[in-house]
Every structure is written in structure tokens, then in C-alpha cells.
């Protein structure tokens, strides 16, 4: 019996269903989109692919849009039960994905308990019952807590904009067939054909099915099964995904924050349209193009949509400024706004410069050069480049940045794929940083382009890598625009460091295990002890000049290990940060005291040397209590130093500019502090670098 026939028998048994509708012409574009994508994967993907499995994965992903009981959200709580027994269990009726330490609600099923309790798409769940989302690492962990006996109630704590809400949600009204059909492994294996699945969903699902939407979910799931980095980008997400790497976007040029449903300008970007017309930090935006934007429910995305637009177009904003009764009206002409990848650059010690790079964009090397010229004019002879939490970006930017450090013609990286020949990238020009000691700071979130630069510096014995083992992303994606304007990024090759290492960590366990691997390092002790790292002895290599032993197959191992420091944190501190209370308070407090602060601390250096948070802390604690965070003396004392420094950094950011935050907070950056010590202790540096 073939799979299509078995599908018909199962459907007929469960639903007395006797046939599929004819293919509607409206489905044609989605069919073509899927066909094009399957063809591209077959021709370009880094490894051989099973086309039939691809299409099966596509269908499984489509089913997730219609129900929370998808292939990768299947609950072990009910998997062993018979179909009849499974019917007694229901969920609250949402589909979701992880977003940081929260669960982002993507869709709410009509008439479900979630909908009736007021949960909406975009809500961020932080707690289910007594269980924090931050303690969950698998989709199945979340599902285990969402699923329960029919008509039972669960408390859901969530964040909507800046507000924390607790909803009592009943497990009820998830349609019977969602659980039976999509939790049935036999049936899931039977629906393995895209065209068949579209007909199937049209035929049995009681609500109208938007095929383009469920197809997008299917494509995402299918690509996720290939590897963790092949991905699909919708029209809505393309701008947010590409703007940081392009290095600019078109808008009015303000950083803002929403506090108590009020849009407050944190900074008018220097040289941008808003600064030119006179908008200032602390201004409150109340009207945009004659529409009142103050009030309950305003979101960051709503504000961005109103302020972004075509270059040369105009937007009228009305501002409430402290000490001025009347609203101020400004007409702003939208223009290109730079997105900087250098967060900060300054001298951290005599002769030692520091640059923090947040990604590898089209403009990153120019930004680095500008910073280097400035630092050299201030006496820099050695550089610390901070790539901690830098997730990467353009490969060629990584190559060009490495060229600034390496002399002569040296290979930086090579790439090789199944259908793409090996290609080597070498240094070509005389760089600004070919002399002096170099330290690269890395951690478990330094990935991709960050690892290319770190690998090249390490393999050519040019400097020291300090911190913790990097993420381990050695796959290269090619962005491909689809006819409908959406985009896919398909892994086409792997990259290799100059010594021949591929530092890609294993991903055969699936995307969830892949993402969780960073947490596994924490649990195993690797984040705290270098000797807890398990090297793959089959992936042993030597550096090019000093013949030091280095390893492949799982990130770049630093030359000097700095453990993760958790001694200065506590539950109270984490709540101040996670709930946004610290940021909100600092902005409100600075706005209230701005004139006095600007008069007393006319320069940042005065502020850094003389400002004390002792009196402000009491106001922060009071503000936090009003926001629902109960004060805990023991928890506060445990993180007292961290809380004070973080508050001072937030105030500096709001009073001066974004970069000043790092000049304060870096006092807590143990990896940076150790790197300064290594450079200043010349013998220790030479011993590690084998100079």
C-alpha cells in the first residue's frame, strides 16, 4: 500500500472523509515557491539531501501553524497514551517560539482558553504556573506545562510591552481533531506530500486556511531540519534582519524607549534629521502625523512603522518638553541613518586601546579604522578587540578586518561546499594593526565572522584569544531572494581556518539541542573550568608559525581562559534587568534631573569620576516596588556592586550617549580586566603567545 492510500484510509476512518477538493488556482504561487526552493536546496546545499524527507518536513512544519501539537512540540506526557486517552488532555491553544528568556506567542487558536483569557500574538510568556521560562530549554519543556487535563486552569505570567500580566487560562476548546490527527505518528508519516497536504487542510479544517502563511511555517521548519542556520525570512522581517548588516536604514534618527505608554527620546542620533531640527534627549513624542501615539498598548513596532519611510519623505511630530507648556511641532525629513557596529572605543589603560564590535556589517572596517586612528593619536600601542556576544555578519568584512592585523599575503579563511569549489581568501594590503600586542575577547556567543577573525589571529600566532570557547558556527549561508520578495539563507559551504580547522560544532541532534548546547556548557562546568572542556582529539591542528596545538569541531578555544563570573548577580538583580525596571527608572530619573546633572557634570569624565549612586539606589528600590518587584535585602546585598555599576551605566547612557554605557559597565567585564593585566605583564603575554 502506498503512503497516499494509507492517508486516505486513516482519514476515512477518523472523519468519514471521502475525497479532496480540486486544486484552487490561488494555490499556484505557493506551489511554485515551494518547487523553486526545493530545486535550490537540491542544487546548492552543502550536503546531499533526501528530497522526499524535505517535503515531509515541510508538511510537518505547516501543521504547526494550525495547532500547537507539532512534530517538535509533541508532549511526552501524552505520547504513550492511546488516541482515545489523549482526547482527555488539552492545551491553552497557542503556537510559540523561544525569544531570549521568554516564550513569544506567535498565534492564538480561536475559541481557545488562551484567546478567552486575553492572550494575544506578541505576548512574551515568562512563567507558566510556578515554572520560569528561563529554566526551560526545549520546546517540549514548555509544552509539558501547557498541556493538562481538560478544563484545568493554569496561571500564565507574561509581558506585554512594558507591563507584566498574570492570566488564569483554562485548558479547553482545542478542537478534538488537532490532538488526534497531528499527535498521531502514523498519520504524520502519511502526509508527506505538499500538494496533498494543502488539499487535506482545506478539506478538514473548519476555519479558512491561509496557504501562504502555513507554507511559510512549513518552509521554516523544513530548513531547520537541514541545519540550524539555514533560514527563511518573511517580508516583514527582511528589513530588521538586513539593516544592521547594510549599515544604515531610512528614518528620522532617534533612539526611543516606551515608559508607561509614553514615547521618550533617549537620543537624537548625532548628525541625523531629528537632531538637525532640534529634537533632544528627554523629549516625549505625543503626536505623529496628527495621530495621538500616547496611551495604552503602543508598541515599539508601532512607533518604528510611523517613523520609518522613504528617503526625502516628511513626518510631523509633536513633542512635550519639560518646562515648556505648549507642544512643540517639528517637521522631519527622513534620511539615511547609520547603524554603527562599533559600540565604543576608548583607552582602557595607558598605551592600551579598546574597541567593542557588535557585528560585521558593510561599514565595520571603516568604523574600526576611524577608531584606530583616534586611539593611536591618544597613545595606543596595543589593542583589545571585544567580540564577546558578536554573532557575526559578512564573511568579507571578517576577511578585510583580519587584513588589518596580518602582514604579507596570508590566508584568512577558505570555504568549500558540495557544489561550490574551494575558495581561499587572503590578505592583500598593509594594515593599521600589524604591530603591537593584540587581544581578541570572545565568549560562547561569539560566532561566525567573529570566529573567522579569532581563528586567523590564533592560527597565525598574531595575538591572544582570551575568554571562553566560541559558539562553533562554521557554516556559510547564501541569501537568495524568492519571487514574492521573501528570502532564504541556505547553507552552501563550510569554512576552514588557516590551519585547516572547521570549527562547526555538531548539529545532528536537531536545532533545539544545538541551541541548548551553550547551556550544556554551563551545566557541565565548562563555563567555569577550562579543564571541563572535552576536546575532539581527531580534530588536532597546529598554528602556522609557533606550532601551538589547536582544535577543530567545536568553536575557537581561547589561549587564556576566563571563567563566567556569576558571583555579582542575584534574583533581585536579574528581575530588575529582565523586567526592564532598571532601564525605565534610569530614563525617568535622568529626565527629571537632566538640567541639574548637565550643570554639575558638564563632561562625561567628571561624571565617571564623581557621580555616586548611593542616594539614587533608594529611589530605584522604591520605583521597583511600585512596579511589583518586592525588595529583598539579602538578594540586593549579594548583587549590590553590580546593581550600582549597572545603574550608573544606564544613567550615563541616557545623559550622554549609548557608548558611555560600556565605559562604566566594563568595570564588571572580567575578561577585559584580565586582558589588560596580561598586556601590562609583558612576560605573561609573551609566554602565552610563545613570542
Which residues make up each language-model segment?
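Bacterial Sec-dependent N-terminal signal peptides
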Residues: 1-27, 37
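Cleft-lining beta-strand/loop regions that shape enzyme active-site pockets
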Residues: 21-30, 34, 38-51, 74, ...
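Amphipathic alpha-helical segments that form the core helices of the histone-fold
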Residues: 56-67, 217-227, 606-624, 646
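Translation machinery proteins
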Residues: 70-99, 228-259, 421
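Generic structural signal for buried aliphatic residues
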Residues: 125, 154, 285-286, 315, ...
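Metal-dependent DNA phosphodiester-chemistry modules and their immediately adjacent helices/loops
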Residues: 448, 496-502
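Flexible, acidic/glycine-enriched loop-and-adjacent beta/alpha segments
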Residues: 464-496, 510-523, 528, 532-535, ...
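Conserved functional hotspot residues or short segments at active or partner-binding sites
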Residues: 502-503, 507-691
Amino acid at each position: 500500500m502506498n503512503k497516499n492510500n494509507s492517508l486516505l484510509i486513516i482519514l476515512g476512518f477518523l472523519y468519514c472523509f471521502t475525497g479532496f477538493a480540486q486544486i484552487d488556482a490561488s494555490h499556484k504561487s505557493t506551489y511554485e515557491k515551494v518547487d523553486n526552493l526545493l530545486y535550490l536546496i537540491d542544487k546548492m546545499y552543502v550536503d546531499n539531501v533526501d528530497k522526499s524527507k524535505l517535503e515531509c518536513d515541510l508538511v510537518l512544519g505547516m501543521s504547526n501553524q494550525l495547532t500547537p501539537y507539532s512534530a517538535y512540540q509533541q508532549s511526552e506526557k501524552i505520547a504513550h497514551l492511546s488516541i482515545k486517552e489523549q482526547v482527555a488532555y488539552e492545551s491553552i491553544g497557542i503556537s510559540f517560539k523561544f525569544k531570549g528568556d521568554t516564550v513569544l506567542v506567535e498565534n492564538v487558536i480561536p475559541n481557545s482558553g488562551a484567546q478567552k483569557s486575553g492572550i494575544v500574538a506578541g505576548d512574551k510568556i515568562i512563567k507558566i504556573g510556578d515554572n520560569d521560562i528561563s529554566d526551560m530549554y526545549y520546546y517540549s519543556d514548555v509544552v509539558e506545562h501547557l498541556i493538562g487535563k481538560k478544563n484545568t486552569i493554569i496561571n500564565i505570567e507574561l509581558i506585554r510591552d512594558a507591563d507584566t500580566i498574570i492570566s488564569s487560562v483554562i485548558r479547553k476548546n482545542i478542537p478534538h481533531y488537532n490532538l488526534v490527527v497531528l499527535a498521531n505518528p502514523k498519520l504524520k508519516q502519511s502526509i508527506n506530500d505538499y500538494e496533498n497536504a494543502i488539499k487535506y487542510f482545506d478539506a478538514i479544517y473548519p476555519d479558512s486556511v491561509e496557504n501562504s502563511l502555513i507554507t511559510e511555517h512549513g518552509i521554516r521548519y523544513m530548513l531547520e531540519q537541514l541545519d540550524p542556520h539555514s533560514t527563511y525570512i518573511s517580508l516583514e522581517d527582511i528589513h530588521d534582519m538586513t539593516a544592521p548588516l547594510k549599515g544604515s536604514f531610512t528614518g528620522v534618527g532617534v533612539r526611543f524607549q516606551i515608559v508607561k505608554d509614553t514615547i521618550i527620546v533617549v537620543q537624537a542620533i548625532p548628525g541625523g534629521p531629528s537632531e538637525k531640527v532640534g529634537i533632544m534627549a528627554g523629549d516625549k513624542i505625543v503626536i505623529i502625523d496628527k495621530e495621538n501615539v500616547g496611551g495604552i498598548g503602543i508598541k515599539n513596532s508601532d512607533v518604528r512603522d510611523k517613523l520609518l519611510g522613504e528617503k526625502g519623505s516628511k513626518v510631523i511630530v509633536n513633542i512635550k518638553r519639560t518646562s515648556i507648556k505648549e507642544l512643540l511641532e517639528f517637521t522631519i525629513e527622513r534620511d539615511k541613518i547609520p547603524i554603527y557596529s562599533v559600540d565604543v572605543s576608548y583607552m582602557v589603560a595607558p598605551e592600551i586601546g579598546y574597541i567593542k564590535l557588535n557585528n560585521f556589517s558593510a561599514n565595520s572596517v571603516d568604523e574600526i579604522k576611524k577608531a584606530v586612528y583616534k586611539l593611536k593619536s591618544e597613545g595606543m600601542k596595543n589593542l583589545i578587540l571585544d567580540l564577546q556576544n558578536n554573532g557575526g555578519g559578512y564573511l568579507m568584512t571578517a576577511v578585510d578586518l583580519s587584513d588589518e592585523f596580518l602582514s604579507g599575503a596570508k590566508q584568512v579563511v577558505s570555504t568549500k561546499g558540495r557544489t561550490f569549489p574551494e575558495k581561499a581568501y587572503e590578505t592583500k594590503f598593509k594594515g593599521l594593526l600589524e604591530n603591537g600586542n593584540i587581544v581578541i575577547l570572545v565568549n560562547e556567543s561569539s560566532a561566525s565572522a567573529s570566529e573567522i577573525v579569532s581563528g586567523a589571529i590564533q592560527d597565525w600566532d598574531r595575538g591572544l584569544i582570551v575568554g571562553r570557547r566560541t559558539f562553533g558556527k562554521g557554516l556559510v549561508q547564501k541569501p537568495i531572494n524568492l519571487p514574492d520578495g521573501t528570502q532564504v539563507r541556505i547553507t552552501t559551504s563550510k569554512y576552514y581556518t588557516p590551519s585547516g580547522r572547521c570549527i562547526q560544532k555538531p548539529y545532528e541532534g536537531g536545532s533545539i539541542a544545538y541551541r541548548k548546547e551553550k547551556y550544556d556548557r554551563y551545566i557541565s562546568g565548562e563555563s567555569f573550568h577550562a579543564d571541563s572542556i572535552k576536546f575532539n582529539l581527531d580534530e588536532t591542528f597546529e598554528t602556522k608559525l609557533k606550532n601551538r596545538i589547536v582544535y577543530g569541531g567545536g568553536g575557537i578555544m581561547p589561549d587564556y581562559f576566563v571563567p563566567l563570573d556569576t558571583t555579582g548577580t542575584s534574583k533581585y538583580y536579574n528581575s530588575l534587568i529582565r523586567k526592564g525596571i532598571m532601564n525605565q527608572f534610569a530614563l525617568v530619573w535622568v529626565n527629571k534631573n537632566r538640567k541639574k546633572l548637565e550643570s554639575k557634570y558638564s563632561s562625561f569624565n567628571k561624571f565617571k569620576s564623581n557621580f555616586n549612586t548611593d542616594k539614587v539606589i533608594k529611589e530605584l528600590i522604591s520605583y521597583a516596588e511600585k512596579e511589583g518587584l518586592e525588595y529583598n535585602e539579602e538578594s540586593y546585598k549579594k548583587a549590590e556592586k553590580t546593581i550600582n555599576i549597572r545603574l550608573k551605566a544606564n544613567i550615563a547612557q541616557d545623559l550622554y550617549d549609548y557608548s558611555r554605557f560600556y565605559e562604566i559597565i566594563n568595570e564588571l567585564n572580567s575578561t577585559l580586566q584580565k586582558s589588560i593585566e596580561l598586556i601590562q605583564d609583558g612576560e605573561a603575554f609573551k609566554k602565552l603567545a610563545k613570542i
